[in-house]
C-alpha cells in the first residue's frame, strides 16, 4: 500500500486520518435493526453487538465481499443473519471507505473485505458459513487474498486469527496482533495476502487440506518467471510463452477489485 494513501484522501490540503473525512459519501447501514441494538463507529467500520454478543479472543473470522452496486443488499443479508444468531459483526461505513479498501494501491491483505463476522466458536462459524453461503448464492465479490473461500461461494471467506483483543507494541511504536497457536503459545497473527494457519490449527471446513503448489506457475500457455508488481488490481509478471520460448509480459486484472473512484474495477 502507498504510505499515507488514506490520509491523502481525507482532506484537500492536509494529511488527516481517513475516518475524519467530512463527506465519505453514501452511508451503509442495515435496513432493519432489532430493538436495543446500535452500531458504533470504529475507524472506517461500523461495529454491531448487543446484550447477547461478545467478542471471543480468537477464532474463525468470516469475511464477506461484495460488488459495490450490490453492497447494501449484501449488508442487509449479512446483518439479518448475524442479528438472528446474536453474533457481532462489522461493515464498512460508507462508499468512500469501500472504494479506499478496494483501491488499486490499498493494502492487499485487507482488500475485498466488506463485512467481518466474529463467531464465538467453531460450531457457530460452520452454521454461519452455511447460512451466508446459501443466502448469498448468486452474488459476486472480490476474492479476499488473506482468506479461503467457503466451498463454492463467490463472496463468503474465512480465516483463523485474533479478534482484536490481544497484541503488543513493536519497537517502532506500531501494534501487532497476537494469536495462540495449537499448543497455546502466543505467536504473531500474520495478516498476509495469502491464506495462513498458525501451527497446530487445522481447517475444519475442508475434507482434505490442499497440497502446496509444486512446479511451474502457468497462465494458459505462459509460464510465469517473475512477479514484477502486485496490487489489488492484479499482478504484472514476466513470463515465457511455452509454445515459442519467447519472453512475454502478462498483466492480470482482478474482478471486482482495484477500484477507481467512479467505482470501475480492474
Residues covered by each model-derived region:
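Short amphipathic alpha-helices in soluble, non-transmembrane regions
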Residues: 77-78, 128-136
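A common structural junction motif
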Residues: 82-86, 133-144
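A conserved alpha-helical element in kinase catalytic cores
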Residues: 68-91, 103-104, 124-125, 254-266
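ATP-binding glycine-rich loop module of kinase domains
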Residues: 54-71, 221-266
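Elongated alpha-helical scaffolds
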Residues: 108-115, 119, 123-130
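Nucleic acid-processing catalytic cores of prokaryotic defense/repair systems
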Residues: 44, 51-75, 91-110
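Juxta-kinase regulatory segment immediately upstream of eukaryotic protein kinase catalytic domains
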Residues: 1-26, 167-227
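Short proline/glycine- and acidic-rich turn/helix-capping motifs at secondary-structure junctions
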Residues: 96-102, 145-168
